[in-house]
A protein has these predicted regions:
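Sec-dependent N-terminal signal peptides
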Residues: 4-13
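Helix C-cap/helix->beta junction micro-motif
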Residues: 131-133, 172-173
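Cell-envelope and extracellular/periplasmic
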Residues: 71-74, 101-102, 106, 110
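Charged helix-capping and loop-helix junction motifs
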Residues: 114-123, 156-163
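Serine-esterase "nucleophile elbow" of acetyl-processing enzymes
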Residues: 18-96
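Glycine-rich anion/phosphate-binding loops
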Residues: 76-83, 112-121
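Catalytic His-Asp segment of secreted/periplasmic serine-dependent ester chemistry enzymes
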Residues: 142-236
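Conserved, well-ordered alpha-helix/loop/beta-strand core segments that scaffold catalytic motifs
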Residues: 98-102, 122-123, 130, 137-139
Length: 236
């Protein structure tokens, strides 16, 4: 009788898996079609989470006029980005990858994780890029003093700690480091309402500050002084 019960449970589990189908945990499928039909050389790819994912929607001209590719996916942690790094970065053969990652690890989107492991995942992305001849621009996390989806957390100090690790690593490896945190910080580890409505994700004015900084980082990586398009708000 016991064997019959166990067998029934096993068959039920298999049936449930088949019914649900496979889960695209790393979301390989998000950019699969866009990657497949890409028919031009790629200069710069932006890898990231919701901050990168939303950037192209908030200011599409910055990406379209510069020919930049946005490969951000909302909610993703560093291990998910690392999993799809080959398909969404390496296989596209860009000259430069801009990496902005880590805030969703601090938010525990996939459960608790030590900052050292978050840092290690980001370093692994840098290693993979450089091994494949892709130059890296490494970005600090943006200031963030609260999560709208996890209001009980106070992330500002962890953000600073991870940024310290990233900045030190970038200096040691001679990788261009873009300090968004310094440019957007309201003095308390967050962002002002002018730059962010939820304390974590920038609005257009925040992205405009980021654009002027990141193009400098891209030029440092390429060893050029190229003039990139950046959006300018009309004078009031």
């Amino acid at each position: 009788m016991k064997k019959i019960v166990l067998l029934s449970l096993a068959l039920f589990s298999v049936a449930a898996l088949r019914a649900d189908g496979p889960v695209d945990w790393a979301q390989y499928g998000r950019y699969e079609l866009q990657n497949a039909v890409l028919d031009r050389p790629v200069e710069v790819v932006f890898m990231g989470n919701s901050i990168t994912d939303s950037w192209i929607r908030v200011d599409p001209d910055f990406f379209e006029r510069n020919g930049f590719l946005d490969r951000g996916i909302s909610g993703q942690t560093t291990v998910q980005m690392l999993a799809r790094f080959r398909s969404d970065v390496i296989d596209l053969k860009p000259q430069v990858v801009v990496i902005l990652a880590g805030i969703n690890d601090i938010a525990r989107n996939n459960g608790p994780i030590e900052l050292e492991n978050v840092f290690g995942n980001i370093v692994s992305m840098c290693d993979l890029a450089r091994y494949n001849g892709i130059k890296v621009v490494l970005c600090s996390l943006l200031p963030c003093d609260r999560f709208s989806w996890r209001p009980e957390m106070e992330p500002a100090d962890e953000v600073r700690r991870l940024n310290t690790m990233l900045e030190r690593y970038a200096a040691e490896q001679k990788i261009p480091y873009v300090d968004y945190h310094r440019a957007l910080d309201n003095g308390s580890g967050g962002m002002s309402e002018e730059l962010s409505q939820d304390g974590c994700h920038p609005v257009l004015s925040g992205y405009l500050r980021m654009e002027s900084l990141v193009v400098e980082g891209i030029n440092r990586a390429l060893g050029v002084q190229k003039t990139w398009y950046t959006t300018v708000l009309p004078a009031k």
